[in-house]
C-alpha cells in the first residue's frame, strides 16, 4: 500500500521578525489615529473661540497682524478736486485702506482734511515727521548758532593735564596724558561719565592714539604715555596736538565732551618735560559759507505713476571738523506729502572723500495728481563711526523748494515726462 505524504506550505519568516512587523504596524496605526483626533479637536476649538496665536509686532508704532502681512502699502491718490473750490490747504485728498492696501473713495463731498489723510497712511510713525522749512523751522529764540550769552557757552567742560617731551636720540615725541578734572555728567542714571581721550597729531593725522576707558568718574587719572617716532625736532613748530575727550556709551555712539588744541609752536621740550593744563572747550565744528554741491536726476513716468530719483554725485563738500578726519558722506532721501514724511531711503557711505560719486537710484510710486504737493529732500550727511553723524547740507525739490534752481528743476520734470533731467544744486545749511 502506497505511503501518503501530507505536504504543508512552509514560511521562511521567523516568529521574531513577524512579531516586529506586527508591532510596527500597530505603532503606525496608533500614531495616525492620534494625529487625526488632534486635528479634529483643534478644528472644533477654532470654531468656538478666537485663535490664541494672534500677535502684534511693533515696528515704530505699526501693528502688523498675521492676516495682513501679505498686503502691500502704496501711496495712492483717490481724487483731487480740480473743478470744485480748493481748500485753504490747497492739497489733494489721499485715502488708503490700511487693511487691503487698495483705494477707498471719499464719500464726503468736501473731502477729508490733509491731517486726516495722513492719519490713514499705512506708514511708520517716524515717517510722520514734518518737513522743516529753512524759513520757518527756526525762530529767533531757537537759532542753531549759539549766541555768546547762551547757556551752552557757560557750561564748564573741565580741564586736561598732560606733558610733552622729546627724545633726541630716538627722534621721538613723547606725550603723557595724565588726568582730567571737572568733566560734565554725561549719564543721567549714574550721574557720571565713562571718559577716554583720543589724540591726533595735526596736520598729517598719521599718528592717532587713544587712552583706555575709565568707568563712572568725572576726574579720571589716565597716566598713559605715547611715543611717536620719526618726528624731527625741527618739525615740532608746525605740529598741533588735538585731544578729543569722549564718554563711552555701550548702547549708542560715544558722546563728545569737548576738545583741546595745543600748537607746539609755543612749547619748547628741548630742556625737558613740559607739563601743561588746558581747559576743555566745546568741539569746534567748522562753519563754512559753501556747503558744496549735489547732482541729482529726476524723471517721472505718468503711465506707471513712478518717480525715479538718481543721486549722482557731490563735489566740494566741506570738512565737518577741525581735524579734517571727516569725509565719509552719504545722502538721505526723504519724500514728503505736504509736510509729512511718507518715505525715506539712503545711499551707501563713500569713505574718505569730499567729492563722492554715488550713482544710486530710488523709485517712488507717486500719482500724477499728487505731484504739486510732493517735496523731495536730500540730506548730505557725514558719517562718523565714533560720534554722531553731522548734516553737511540740504537740498529740497518740489512743493517746498526755496531756491530758484530747485523750483525750476521740479517744473522741468513735471513738464517733461519720461525724460531724465539732471542738474547741479548748491546745498544749503540744515
Swiss-Prot record:
InterPro entries, A to Z: C2_dom, C2_domain_sf, Synaptotagmin
Topological domains annotated Cytoplasmic: 37-430
Bias (Polar residues) ranges: 134-150
Region annotated Disordered, chain positions: 79-120, 132-152
Entries under CDD domains matching the protein: C2A_Synaptotagmin-4-11, C2B_Synaptotagmin-4
Membrane topology field: Single-pass membrane protein
Vesicular side: 1-15
A Pfam family hit: C2
Tissue specificity remark: Expressed in cerebellun, cerebellar cortex, hippocampus, olfactory bulb and spinal cord (at protein level). Expressed by neurons, astrocytes and microglia (at protein level). Expressed in macrophages (at protein level).
UniProt note: phenotype after gene disruption: Knockout is lethal. Conditional knockout mice for dopaminergic neurons show increased dopamine release, accelerated vesicle pools replenishment and enlarged releasable vesicle pools in the striatum. Forebrain-specific conditional knockouts are viable, fertile and have normal life span. They show impaired learning an memory.
Cited SMART domains: C2
Phosphoserine modification, residue list: 133
Chain's role: Synaptotagmin family member involved in vesicular and membrane trafficking which does not bind Ca(2+). Inhibits clathrin-mediated and bulk endocytosis, functions to ensure precision in vesicle retrieval. Plays an important role in dopamine transmission by regulating endocytosis and the vesicle-recycling process. Essential component of a neuronal vesicular trafficking pathway that differs from the synaptic vesicle trafficking pathway but is crucial for development and synaptic plasticity.
UniProt record similarity statement: Belongs to the synaptotagmin family.
Name of the protein in its database record: Synaptotagmin-11
Organism: Mus musculus
Lineage: Eukaryota, Metazoa, Chordata, Craniata, Vertebrata
Name of the gene: Syt11
Amino acid at each position: 500500500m502506497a505511503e501518503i505524504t501530507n505536504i504543508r506550505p512552509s514560511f521562511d519568516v521567523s516568529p521574531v521578525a513577524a512579531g516586529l512587523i506586527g508591532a510596527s504596524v500597530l505603532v503606525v496605526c496608533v500614531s495616525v489615529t492620534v494625529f487625526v483626533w488632534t486635528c479634529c479637536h483643534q478644528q472644533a476649538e477654532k470654531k468656538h473661540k478666537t485663535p490664541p496665536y494672534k500677535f502684534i509686532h511693533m515696528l515704530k508704532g505699526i501693528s502688523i497682524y498675521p492676516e495682513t502681512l501679505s498686503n502691500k502699502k502704496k501711496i495712492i491718490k483717490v481724487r483731487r478736486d480740480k473743478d470744485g473750490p480748493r481748500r485753504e490747504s490747497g492739497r489733494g485728498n489721499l485715502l488708503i485702506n490700511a487693511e487691503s492696501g487698495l483705494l477707498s473713495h471719499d464719500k464726503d463731498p468736501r473731502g477729508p482734511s490733509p491731517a486726516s489723510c495722513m492719519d490713514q497712511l499705512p506708514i511708520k510713525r517716524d515717517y510722520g515727521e514734518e518737513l522743516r522749512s529753512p524759513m520757518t523751522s527756526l525762530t529767533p529764540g531757537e537759532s542753531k548758532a549759539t549766541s555768546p550769552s547762551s547757556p551752552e557757552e557757560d557750561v564748564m567742560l573741565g580741564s586736561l593735564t598732560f606733558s610733552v617731551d622729546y627724545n633726541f636720540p630716538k627722534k621721538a615725541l613723547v606725550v603723557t596724558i595724565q588726568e582730567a578734572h571737572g568733566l560734565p555728567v554725561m549719564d543721567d542714571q549714574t550721574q557720571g561719565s565713562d571718559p577716554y581721550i583720543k589724540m591726533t597729531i595735526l596736520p598729517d593725522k598719521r599718528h592717532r592714539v587713544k587712552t583706555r576707558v575709565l568707568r563712572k568718574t568725572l576726574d579720571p587719572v589716565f597716566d598713559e604715555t605715547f611715543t611717536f617716532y620719526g618726528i624731527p625736532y625741527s618739525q615740532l613748530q608746525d605740529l598741533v596736538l588735538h585731544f578729543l575727550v569722549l564718554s563711552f556709551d555701550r548702547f549708542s555712539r560715544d558722546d563728545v565732551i569737548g576738545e583741546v588744541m595745543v600748537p607746539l609752536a609755543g612749547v619748547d621740550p628741548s630742556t625737558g618735560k613740559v607739563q601743561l593744563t588746558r581747559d576743555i572747550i566745546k568741539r569746534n565744528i567748522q562753519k563754512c559759507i559753501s556747503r558744496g554741491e549735489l547732482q541729482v536726476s529726476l524723471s517721472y513716468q505718468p503711465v506707471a505713476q513712478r518717480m525715479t530719483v538718481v543721486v549722482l554725485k557731490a563735489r566740494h563738500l566741506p570738512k565737518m571738523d577741525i581735524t579734517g578726519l571727516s569725509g565719509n558722506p552719504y545722502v538721505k532721501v526723504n519724500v514728503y506729502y505736504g509736510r509729512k514724511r511718507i518715505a525715506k531711503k539712503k545711499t551707501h557711505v563713500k569713505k574718505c572723500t569730499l567729492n563722492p560719486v554715488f550713482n544710486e537710484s530710488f523709485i517712488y510710486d507717486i500719482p500724477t495728481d499728487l505731484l504739486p504737493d510732493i517735496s523731495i529732500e536730500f540730506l548730505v550727511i557725514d558719517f562718523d563711526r565714533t560720534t554722531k553723524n553731522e548734516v553737511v547740507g540740504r537740498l529740497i525739490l518740489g512743493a517746498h523748494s526755496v531756491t530758484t534752481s530747485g523750483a525750476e528743476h521740479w517744473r522741468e520734470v513735471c513738464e517733461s515726462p519720461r525724460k531724465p533731467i539732471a542738474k547741479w544744486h548748491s546745498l544749503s545749511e540744515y
